[in-house]
């Protein structure tokens, strides 16, 4: 059981290089929303 806690404790260090990606993730749905508007504008809101 202790080894499981050790693995969980080391995970943040393992994922440290991915921090910038995680910071950007919440913005992605907003980009999809904007993409939907751009797409509708390009087909002139049919």
From Swiss-Prot:
Q: How does it sit in the membrane?
A: Single-pass membrane protein
The record's GO CC annotations read:
chloroplast thylakoid membrane; photosystem II reaction center
Source domain of life: Eukaryota
Subcellular locations according to the entry: Plastid, Chloroplast thylakoid membrane
What processes does the entry annotate via GO biological process terms?
photosynthesis
Q: Which residues form the propeptide?
A: 1-9
Q: Which residues cross the membrane?
A: 21-41
Alphabetical keyword list: Chloroplast, Membrane, Photosynthesis, Photosystem II, Plastid, Reaction center, Thylakoid, Transmembrane, Transmembrane helix
Q: Name one Pfam family in it.
A: PsbK
InterPro entries, alphabetized? PSII_PsbK, PSII_PsbK_sf
Record-stated family: Belongs to the PsbK family.
Function of this protein? One of the components of the core complex of photosystem II (PSII). PSII is a light-driven water:plastoquinone oxidoreductase that uses light energy to abstract electrons from H(2)O, generating O(2) and a proton gradient subsequently used for ATP formation. It consists of a core antenna complex that captures photons, and an electron transfer chain that converts photonic excitation into a charge separation.
Spell out the subunit comment: PSII is composed of 1 copy each of membrane proteins PsbA, PsbB, PsbC, PsbD, PsbE, PsbF, PsbH, PsbI, PsbJ, PsbK, PsbL, PsbM, PsbT, PsbX, PsbY, PsbZ, Psb30/Ycf12, at least 3 peripheral proteins of the oxygen-evolving complex and a large number of cofactors. It forms dimeric complexes.
The protein depicted here goes by the name Photosystem II reaction center protein K
């Amino acid at each position: 059981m202790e080894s499981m806690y050790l693995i969980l404790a080391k995970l943040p260090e393992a994922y440290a290089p991915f921090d910038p990606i995680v910071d950007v993730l919440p913005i992605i749905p907003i980009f999809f929303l904007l993409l939907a508007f751009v797409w509708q504008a390009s087909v002139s809101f049919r």
